[in-house]
C-alpha cells in the first residue's frame, strides 16, 4: 500500500500476516497498523531550504569586490526524524576549496552540505547520507584592478621569493 502522510510518501509491503487466509481484513489491518506507526512516530524535517544559507556557511573570495559571500542551498535538504527526538541533526558544510578567485557567476557550486544520521533505526534506512550542493548566492565581480594587481604581486613574492 502507499500513502502520503506529513509530506512523506509511504510505501509498505507486509508479508506473512497471521490469519490472512481466514480473515480477509487481516492484510489491510496489518498494513494500516504499519502506516499509522510511521505517521505517528516520524516527521519530515527540512534542514536547509532551497535558496537560503545554512547557518554561517560562506566562502572567502580573492580579488573580488567582496571578501566573503554566503553559500545557499541548491535544493531542500530533508530528513526523516523521530517525533520528540532530542538529538540535534549533524550537518556539515564542506567547501570545494579554501578560497575562490573572482569573478564568480551566481549559483556557482562551491561545496556540499551533508547530513549524518546519528539516530539509526537498525542499520538505518539510507544507503548513503543525504547531501546537497551549496552554491554562490549572487555574482561576484572582479575587484578594482589595482587591488587585483597588488594581491597577485604579494602572492608572487610569498611563493617565489
Residue ranges: model-predicted function:
Residues 1-161:
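Domain-terminus/edge residues, biased toward the C-terminal soluble/receptor-binding domains
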Amino acid at each position: 500500500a502507499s500513502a502520503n502522510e506529513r509530506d512523506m510518501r509511504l510505501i509498505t509491503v507486509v508479508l506473512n500476516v497471521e490469519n490472512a487466509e481466514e480473515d480477509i481484513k487481516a492484510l489491510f489491518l496489518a498494513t494500516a497498523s504499519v502506516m499509522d506507526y510511521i505517521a505517528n512516530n516520524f516527521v519530515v524535517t527540512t534542514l536547509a531550504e532551497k535558496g537560503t544559507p545554512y547557518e554561517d556557511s560562506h566562502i572567502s573570495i580573492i580579488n573580488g569586490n567582496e571578501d566573503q559571500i554566503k553559500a545557499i542551498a541548491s535544493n531542500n535538504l530533508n530528513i526523516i526524524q523521530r517525533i520528540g527526538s532530542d538529538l540535534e541533526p549533524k550537518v556539515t558544510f564542506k567547501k570545494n576549496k579554501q578560497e575562490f578567485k573572482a569573478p564568480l557567476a551566481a549559483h556557482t557550486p562551491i561545496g556540499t552540505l551533508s547530513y549524518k544520521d546519528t539516530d539509526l533505526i537498525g542499520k538505518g534506512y539510507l544507503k548513503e547520507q543525504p547531501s546537497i550542493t551549496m552554491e554562490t548566492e549572487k555574482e561576484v565581480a572582479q575587484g578594482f584592478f589595482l587591488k587585483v594587481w597588488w594581491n597577485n604581486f604579494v602572492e608572487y613574492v610569498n611563493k617565489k621569493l
